Amino acid sequence: MTNLRKTHPLMKIINDAFIDLPAPSNISAWWNFGSLLGICLIIQILTGLFLAMHYTSDTLTAFSSVAHICRDVNYGWLIRNLHANGASMFFMCLFLHVGRGIYYGSYLFKETWNIGVILLLTVMATAFVGYVLPWGQMSFWGATVITNLLSAIPYIGTTLVEWIWGGFSVDKATLTRFFAFHFILPFIVTAMVIVHLLFLHETGSNNPSGLNPDSDKIPFHPYYTIKDALGLLLMVLLLLLLAMFSPDMLGDPDNFSPANPLNTPPHIKPEWYFLFAYAILRSIPNKLGGVLALLMSILVLLIIPLLHTSKQRSLMFRPISQILFWLLAADLFTLTWIGGQPVEQPFIIIGQVASILYFLLIIALMPLAGLLENYMLKPKW
């Protein structure tokens, strides 16, 4: 009798995706982040489900319902801290996953890459609407400022903003619909993750060398299941350390005050994982221009496959492009820092230079470096 996992219609799918999947023998720890993101998504859905059992999406009771979860619900404080810091872990893994894709040329799997970028946008939307739910000061003003950006769209902008708000300001209707969106979006994300994996398994994984790995494949289980388990252990350790010992380290102190439409916080800023995009938005002194730059900061990822000029796939053997890649990483750190600073000199000019450099590196400098490296590969005799 053949093994059930190879014959049963459902088990066969799981087997082909996680057990007998042929994987390159040389993929490094940078390939762990896909599985870590899957775990993050499961953690977020489970903790979110338990929070939703006790949360009320009403402007009068939302803030106190979150306080009630932390004070009166069994392990409510832990569930809430895991959910809030789980989002930070999610984005940490996301950024590293995307960075890996850029470094090793994984973006040349165009379908997998494109759905990945759409996934990134969807997760960002989910995190944004989720941040509004506790109805603290920064929740309220963050929602007001970010939704207001849509009013920059010519002709339909103002109508669109009021339609999203469900009134003339961020109020009860806004909170209720944001809760509905925050509940449904993770399931849409899960469906998209399955499609992401489907496209990936059409081609098989890339590897650090960027060469065709077909000549040397090993089964996913036990080799990469155990390797992923180690990554999972380290991530859960970091998450638990964060949630248990300093749960509010990455949050904003303003969110301990209930939302007050009559009192604007001195510095309105989003969570750390949006600061780089927020810095790009603020670096352009025009509203519509800023909104377009904000959108482009993520959508530029979609054109990276079209800008690949090198004869080699990976950056492993391309020292000039490596320098530019790490310059891009440093630039993103700079933008993240600037996004959290007040709008005054010298932060304004640093943000503007960093924003220009961000787009310049991706659109011009890295493709040019690829061409230069191609030229340097040619024998000169």
From Swiss-Prot:
A GO molecular function held by the record: ubiquinol-cytochrome-c reductase activity
GO terms classed as biological process: mitochondrial electron transport, ubiquinol to cytochrome c
Membrane topology recorded in Swiss-Prot or TrEMBL: Multi-pass membrane protein
TM annotation in the entry: 33-53, 77-98, 113-133, 178-198, 226-246, 288-308, 320-340, 347-367
Binding site for heme b b562: H83, H182
Principal location listed in the UniProt entry: mitochondrion
Positions with a binding annotation for a ubiquinone: H201
Family annotation (InterPro entries): Cyt_b/b6_C, Cyt_b/b6_C_sf, Cyt_b/b6_N, Cytb/b6-like_sf, Cytochrome_b, Cytochrome_b_C_euk/bac, Cytochrome_b_N_euk/bac, Di-haem_cyt_TM
Cofactor note: Binds 2 heme b groups non-covalently.
UniProt keyword Protein biosynthesis present: no
Keywords: Electron transport, Heme, Iron, Membrane, Metal-binding, Mitochondrion, Mitochondrion inner membrane, Respiratory chain, Transmembrane, Transmembrane helix, Transport, Ubiquinone
Keyword Electron transport: yes
Alphabetized Pfam families for the sequence: Cytochrom_B_C (PF00032), Cytochrome_B (PF00033)
Binding site residues for heme b b566: H97, H196
GO CC entries: mitochondrial inner membrane; respiratory chain complex III
Subcellular location: Mitochondrion inner membrane
PANTHER family assigned: CYTOCHROME B
Biological function: Component of the ubiquinol-cytochrome c reductase complex (complex III or cytochrome b-c1 complex) that is part of the mitochondrial respiratory chain. The b-c1 complex mediates electron transfer from ubiquinol to cytochrome c. Contributes to the generation of a proton gradient across the mitochondrial membrane that is then used for ATP synthesis.
Assembly and oligomerization: The cytochrome bc1 complex contains 11 subunits: 3 respiratory subunits (MT-CYB, CYC1 and UQCRFS1), 2 core proteins (UQCRC1 and UQCRC2) and 6 low-molecular weight proteins (UQCRH/QCR6, UQCRB/QCR7, UQCRQ/QCR8, UQCR10/QCR9, UQCR11/QCR10 and a cleavage product of UQCRFS1). This cytochrome bc1 complex then forms a dimer.
Additional facts recorded: Heme 1 (or BL or b562) is low-potential and absorbs at about 562 nm, and heme 2 (or BH or b566) is high-potential and absorbs at about 566 nm.
Family: Belongs to the cytochrome b family.
Protein name: Cytochrome b
Gene name, Swiss-Prot/TrEMBL: MT-CYB
